[in-house]
């Protein structure tokens, strides 16, 4: 199981606050760019919750109607990273990682391409030990064992579900452990 913040799905406009404040409301749509479109908001109190809930549930993001919200516990990360596994065309799955997460990965790859780490994953054996060590070094990971376990879980999620993309942005370091703070 990949560690994530405590969360609750809201599909009803009459729903009451599901957890103590503050928490984050996230539009549930099958597209990226939710934050830029106003589909991710912090709720500090009940008034903000009601305003943001109504606004986001009435939203359309990139031609996708919002039908649900994820209320998620606010988590303070010491660091934020980026991690994804993607399948493009007929090539092997590719892991993409960056020690700067929580941002637009396309912008980072344009402005500072040396920060992006890309490596192919053998679909039969997964990442090799030397690849994991290299990745941990490039991402400046302190707890390497936690990182190796986390990467293994992400690989299994990708391969076991037949996904074309698993993206974690940001991948947070919270209390010394890795946590998927947002994903698709």
Residues covered by each model-derived region:
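A conserved helix-loop-beta module that forms one wall/lid of the active-site cleft
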Residues: 1-21, 27
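Glycine-rich phosphate-binding loop of ATP-grasp-fold ATP-dependent ligases
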Residues: 5-7, 25-52, 82, 104-108, ...
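ATP-grasp fold ATP-binding core
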Residues: 19-35, 62-78, 83, 154-158, ...
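ATP-dependent carboxylate/phosphate-activation module, predominantly the ATP-grasp catalytic core
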Residues: 38, 94-143, 184
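Catalytic core of tubulin tyrosine ligase-like
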Residues: 51, 55-62, 135
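Hydrophobic alpha-helical hairpins/lids featuring a short glycine-rich hinge
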Residues: 62-120
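A long amphipathic alpha-helix within ATP-dependent nucleotide-binding catalytic cores
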Residues: 131-171
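Terminal amphipathic helices with adjacent charged low-complexity linkers/tails
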Residues: 172-184
């Amino acid at each position: 199981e990949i560690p994530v913040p405590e969360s609750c799905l809201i599909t009803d406009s009459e729903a009451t606050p599901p957890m103590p404040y503050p928490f984050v409301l996230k539009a549930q749509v099958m597209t990226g760019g939710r934050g830029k479109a106003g589909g991710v908001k912090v709720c500090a109190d009940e008034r903000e919750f009601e305003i943001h809930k109504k606004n986001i549930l009435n939203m359309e993001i990139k031609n996708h109607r919002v039908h649900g919200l994820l209320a998620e516990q606010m988590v303070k990360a010491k660091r934020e990273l980026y991690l994804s596994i993607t399948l493009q065309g007929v090539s092997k799955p590719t892991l993409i990682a960056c020690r700067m997460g929580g941002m637009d990965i396309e912008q980072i790859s344009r402005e500072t391409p040396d920060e992006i780490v890309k490596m192919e994953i053998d679909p039969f054996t997964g990442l090799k030990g030397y690849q994991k060590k290299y990745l941990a070094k490039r991402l400046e990971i302190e707890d390497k064992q936690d990182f190796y376990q986390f990467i293994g879980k992400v690989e299994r999620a990708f391969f076991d579900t037949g996904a074309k993309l698993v993206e974690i942005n940001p991948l947070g370091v919270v209390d010394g452990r890795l946590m998927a703070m947002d994903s698709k």
